[in-house]
Amino acid sequence: QQYSEYLDTVDTAVFQQSPFHAKKFEHDGWTVEFIQASQEKEVYATCMLAYLPLMKVFKYCYVARGFLADYKDKDKLVKFTSSLRQYLKKKNVVYLETDPEIDLVQRDKDGNVVENCFHNYDVVDNLKLAGFLQLPLKQGYDLSKECRFCSSIDLRGKTSDEIFNAFSSATRRNTR
């Protein structure tokens, strides 16, 4: 309940971090729990942990689409992941995987990096500092993983026809 209420206050929350997605995990045999970290009664990080048993004794833990946290705040990120690591060790978790939904670099509709665009390479550096390893950024599909590249469209102030007509001809053809 507390987790759901917190999600309602965060702009960056995605479906994969929702209690609805937790129910899907549970239906598929995962054990799910929600944790949060706070400082002076202010929540600064939270996440949904999903566990699967490994070899009857150990566990694999997956944090779908990452923590709800400010990845640019290096100190709090390191503090949270350090506490999380200790917590998971007590639960016999031997592998933690996460795939945070972070806009790494701005790309155009063809997937090319936009010149003089925003980037979040510092976020990747902060996660590495917190002890995470980055898997290679590969294009293509891997059905065992969430997609690595996501596109988003700003829908504000546009009609459905304007949005649809801005798609490439192949995308328009495939969505009719």
What are the language-model segments listed below?
Residues K23-E115:
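Conserved donor-binding loop and adjoining core beta-sheet/short helix segment
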Residues L7-D11, L84-L88, L127:
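Hydrophobic, Leu/Ile/Phe/Ala-enriched alpha-helical segments that form helix-helix packing faces
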Residues Q1-H21, R176:
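Short amphipathic alpha-helix that is part of the acyltransferase structural core
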Residues V114, F118-N126:
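Extracellular disulfide-rich cysteine clusters
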Residues T12, W30, V93, L129-L133:
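Short aromatic/hydrophobic-glycine micro-motifs
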